[in-house]
């Protein structure tokens, strides 16, 4: 059996459908969907991953031994050497307070003292998708060979390499090959699997270099900024090697705007028309001196034309110019063009990925702007005409004329520019998908068409001795504009006038104006500026901008830095300017490119980045107090959610020192003890204007943003009438019935925590309780689950009614493993059992458990095993 590993389930399905001699059979291994089919007389199976199946992380501590030196230990006993600088203090330490341990340093908790050690801590790879890994190994044991068919780029090659390492754990001698493709067309997939190549380990190493460097820099800088001014309130202050200089670009532009000193100028403008023309045929006229910088001169000129009703045409000039067709889309140019149409870069990439997975467009993460000679452009145009009737007339013209594609400045051999494949059914696409697909399809056609011809007519007018001008452009020959109208200005048709003709003039006015500061970046322009400065990659720039919005460093579009974003950059620029400069990030990205080319090694590049970070951190730690003071006001403002209804002081987001949970508390504490719970699993932000204060109780109202769900607004006061939900009987308790007593199961919302649950009226005796979704109107059905006997309820949400069994341990839910907290039907017994198991587990951990509490830790990749030592070896 041949095992084919794709990056996602949709990709696995597409590959199976394209290669299969018949219809692929959908199957399951454990809980993972797979596709079985026959190809060239051989049994094949495709499995789709969920992106990265391994995630980089740190062990819980770094330890020191006089003979072994510094090291970390994973749960399975593997010892990873840590190349700590000699200047870092070694145990024994004068204090036993965390992060200091008897034999090392704890790096699990967020402590400033641990950051120099975290900078040099070994990186381990933990299973991010246990079920997928389990299924992958199961298939590998039954396979004769494996084909890696993940996306062909750094991330895809790393995903494939990680998957292969898991395969090697159970099938070390399995032959492996690589399929490289740029779209899910049958021809492309068939060609890729007929021409298999080897896995590019250099490319995978470059991807892992970026992964490790981003983890190390992000963890150290984020912890530092958060700890520098925490005080138990506010959000985590995110930072990173790319996002920080990107934020600095926006703040730098904002500083330019704030420092801008406007200058006064004056303009004289009005309207003109051929004599007797209708009002709709009027055209704009302006004084030949576009801007008067002298007010007296402007008023003198205006005095000559004020009230004048006619002008004489002094000259008529016509000129034609060619507008060249655009170059093919690469990722950045697509994001910029889509942003101009109202689609953010991050959303553009999500939509483009869905179009790619559906087989409608080619691979969307590319730098290439030159179509390869192997791409049959005519065939793509012909296919495009068949599936898209609206573009058929343009496609026909493209096929009839000379087809000479434009060329951009960047030519690579990995993937072609982004183009429509000519397959699929565009009519099934929704609004955003259709809008982006049309942009891509029309851009592709435009790159194959000729230039547009634009004719400009310029009129020079004499208005009572003062020179005026009027100008208008008309599209004479559409050329590529017939396919690609984006950004095209409306025709400004000038009347057919000749020298000496008289025209009427109207509404001539003198306008006082001021020069404008530099414009803020749009998201599209910011992506282009990041590319220009060497910040991020084609695959990461959009997500970096999205991240800056998520942590509230940026707001609005055009992009504007928040008070906190400005404070962070100002402080870092003062105490560690290298972090905010794009030069260091560009240098590290260049190092990764050398790894990709085989000119450098992953180990050397990551070590170099650690050294750079260590120097930056050393400077920051010297100025922690000053930096904390510099961002203090902004941190407080960022944490604020409203005014306390009791004392009027600020209510802010706080974090409990004991539970690490979030809540809203008053800045007047301890004199004022007002606190409110915060819904779990959401990002909280304040509302503005009238919506910010609850009309019922006067407490603040907040916006809650769940992960990848629709945001909702609530009053922070759980006892507020707007949050009240009446108790609802949903059934009778099965456990109580078996014990010979009656108990009702009641759906209830806690006034203290805001959480919803179902609990028996005899809970103290039976311990029966079930969790409920945080949102959605509940309806009792009176029915019970045939499998477990728990109540069946209906939850009405914006996405529709959901009929569910409330028991999270119900056998019917085994097909989809429950995530998050499990519910025990016999709570008191279950809690004791769980506690006993945890206690036993703690007692049986290895001697070095303080350094390795991550139960899922796995050995790092085979290719590096020669550099690692085990405890047994020592």
Say what each PLM segment does:
Residues 142, 184-270, 319:
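C-terminal or mid-to-C-terminal helical accessory/interaction module adjacent to the motor/catalytic core
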Residues 150-152, 336-338, 365:
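Short glycine-centered, acidic/aromatic-flanked micro-motifs in structured strand/loop junctions
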Residues 2-3, 35, 166, 222, ...:
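Basic, low-complexity terminal or inter-domain segments flanking catalytic cores
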Residues 1-217, 506:
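Intrinsically disordered, low-complexity regulatory segments
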Residues 124, 150-152, 170-177, 197-204, ...:
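Short, polar/flexible loop-turn hinges at active-site or ligand-entry regions and domain interfaces
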Residues 39-47, 51-125, 234-353, 357, ...:
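Long, highly charged, low-complexity internal segments
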Residues 361-367:
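Short amphipathic alpha-helical interface patches used for protein-protein assembly/oligomerization
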Residues 9-16, 43, 98, 102-104, ...:
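Amphipathic alpha-helical transducer elements in NTP-driven molecular machines
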